[in-house]
């Protein structure tokens, strides 16, 4: 049983099966959807928060997609040994897209908040008060704006979707561009507010 957990473009698990089949022609891999194989291959994206990896490996739901139904069942049986959350079965492509969609969703929502902060700055509106008031609507939950998007995943994963379908990803691409441009906007605001010879201390900069 081989399980890929790394965030990957859609189709990566299938490519992995073909690579392994070429390297080991003596073994049968699920390269064409057949179940009569010796090696089962599946994709199950990791969903962990740095600093809480061990706890979330056990408690979080897992999306498990095999290249065949038998691959999915075998991988699901493995995760049920230690996962307390739900183990939800699907196919490999859907599981791959699921992880990319989760992080792209977060990126788009962060971009809305970041763009709102830029607009409010131009219109002389307190963005924090605005968001607090808007979120009093029972179906509105605007996130807090910041200096961009960090981490290993959110700033990277949306580009996998954009690359796979560039003509249909205008929103995802724009969100990435908004968040990528926010650090420069923040630096420019700081530079304009500083006096000549000012000293700047950066706390928590990594």
Annotate each predicted stretch with a short phrase.
Residues 1-206:
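Structural/interface elements that position substrates and couple domains in central-metabolism enzymes
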